Amino acid sequence: MRFMQRSKDSLAKWLSAILPVVIVGLVGLFAVTVIRDYGRETAAARQTLLEKGSVLIRALESGSRVGMGMRMHHAQQQALLEEMAGQPGVRWFAVTDEQGTIVMHSNSGMVGKQLYSPQEMQQLHPGDEEVWRRIDSADGEPVLEIYRQFQPMFAAGMHRMRHMQQYAATPQAIFIAFDASNIVSAEDREQRNTLIILFALATVLLASVLSFFWYRRYLRSRQLLQDEMKRKEKLVALGHLAAGVAHEIRNPLSSIKGLAKYFAERAPAGGEAHQLAQVMAKEADRLNRVVSELLELVKPTHLALQAVDLNTLINHSLQLVSQDANCREIQLRFTANDTLPEIQADPDRLTQVLLNLYLNAIQAIGQHGVISVTASESGAGVKISVTDSGKGIAADQLEAIFTPYFTTKAEGTGLGLAVVHNIVEQHGGTIQVASLEGKGARFTLWLPVNITRKDPQG
């Protein structure tokens, strides 16, 4: 079962790592495809008009060429142009001289007027190749205009005739304008569809990213829950052990301590026997203290709740360690926060928590350093931070820092922070640690203003 659970956890972690990459890759590929295809419909609609315009221009040139060979009058050529301009979608069809004066126009009333000024004709500079542009007509409607030089003079094998000299001497330009509403509609449709698709892709991408972080958070919370369950199971085991150990060890310890004091009183002061008896008594006290701490860790915690002024409590707790801190030239810093609300807590237990953190900080600093305490309102509770300038905690030790019997010091039982964690938890709060090795540590407590009493057995 454990192997299967580990396999599922490994698969979940692998999927949580690889799925976002796959989704982002697919979304990116789809987005590139959408962007690459953008404008194809518009280009196709525009190409259709360009081909149609080219055919009409060549047809007019061909008709004019045949007409010149047959000495067709200008009125007949004008009629030919008007006939061709009747094609669907044609807004106007015109031939101008190099100054922009209209020679022929689909609207005969425009003949002799200026289609474009000489300056505009110089800018347009009609050549042998057809050129297109998007403009707005006089009525504000979009049109696609195609223009180039008007070349009705020659076809393959055709010789210039005398009556054609007037056409050769006067360069002319031909303009044909199509209704561009289809192109505009295609552009709007493509833009709208592209925006919808990109928005959908962005939504999928955002949902994937959020799901990734949510799932990682879920895995982490599940891991924390599993760790907490293991810790509680360990505490239960310690409770059973402590119940037996306390009875079996404390009675012999009392006898050993009594005998040690008896021998110390009987032995000559300063002698070896006297010193050994004192060592026995001290070790008996130390072992008794370890048993007491073990019992305190695992036994149900009874909280004597009352309204607590944190400013007063923190100042009082700092005074208790001030002498030890002064001896080591360690500064204790705390500025009272008048905006702090009173909280429901057990002042003795809370003082025990702070003292434990202070003493750990003093031991981590050794000599010459600073311990800073801050308190502030945080949501529906208060936050207390204890920061020291000590040697810090290694990254691989942070997760186990609240585990019973885990210690980074040569001395100590490793139960102090476990007791702190237990007391804070019984208050309905949380405790976190942040540290960089060699740069000190910060323990942050969060305690609710009003707590819900917990069943000590739970």
UniProtKB/Swiss-Prot annotation:
Modification after translation: Autophosphorylated.
UniProt keyword list: ATP-binding, Cell inner membrane, Cell membrane, Kinase, Membrane, Nucleotide-binding, Phosphoprotein, Stress response, Transferase, Transmembrane, Transmembrane helix, Two-component regulatory system, Zinc
Activity modulation: Activity of the ZraS/ZraR two-component system is repressed by the zinc-bound form of ZraP, which probably interacts with the periplasmic region of ZraS.
Residue ranges, Periplasmic side: 36-194
Modified residues (Phosphohistidine): H247
Sequence ranges on the Cytoplasmic membrane side: 1-14, 216-458
Regions crossing the membrane: 15-35, 195-215
SUPFAM superfamilies: ATPase domain of HSP90 chaperone/DNA topoisomerase II/histidine kinase, Homodimeric domain of signal transducing histidine kinase, Sensory domain-like
Keyword Transcription: no
NCBIfam families: PRK10364.1
Name assigned to this protein: Sensor histidine kinase ZraS
Organism of origin: Escherichia coli O157:H7
Record gene name: zraS
